[in-house]
């Protein structure tokens, strides 16, 4: 386990420091994990913050955190008013050379905490409405030529406020920023997630990679996690009799193994999903937006 010196910077400016619960992080807490997560309260701003620390000094342990720092720096600079993404407060190295970063801690919980195998029209409407909002967040991100790459039910946070979904996207350790990575900066894509687009890691990520993951998350919210154990997502969607034909076509187009056959952008996917929602639940989307 990572040991921290609460009397040394940056921890001397924090209080109530504790490990982040696995239900909120989705990260392993074992000693061999590449980094550890803490929550704390900043003494200066009185805001809650998330602290990430590499478990050991060295390039192997800090590559993902360095990548997250760089991507969040671009996002915060170019989208200063966006509420979808974390704000990077501070980053640097501890006295023992381990890299750290401090960012905003959101109140929302991972979508994974809302997933159930029980299906109802009410839950389907809520899940689709949530994904429409996630699509809006990804439109902002992709406008910067940054792709998240590792979207899954733990990396998308959400809650409902006054009948509308509030969405956050976190964990940019595997993100791909074209301005950096297409020009020689080392990139190490994730390799284990069932939500990962199949063309990775052999090809560079693009918007269609995130689209695959987003549709896989939506199907998981609708049907539960069983498909992640039994088969690939396209096969499961195709065989699922409880998915409406129009929605099934949207999902299958999004998770096609060939990225050339997917929607070309999240904008196109979101438009198709919005049209389906409005035909299925007329007026609901406009009422929620008012």
Regions found by a protein language model. Give the residues of each.
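Conserved HRD-motif arginine in the catalytic loop of eukaryotic-like protein kinases
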Residues: 262
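Short beta-strand micro-motifs within the conserved protein kinase catalytic domain, predominantly
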Residues: 87-99
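ATP-binding glycine-rich loop module of kinase domains
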Residues: 34-68
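Activation segment signature within eukaryotic-like protein kinase domains
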Residues: 130-131
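Conserved activation segment of eukaryotic-like protein kinases, specifically the C-terminal portion
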Residues: 184-199
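Catalytic-loop of the protein kinase fold
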Residues: 142-160
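Conserved short submotifs of the Hanks-type protein kinase catalytic core
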Residues: 96-110
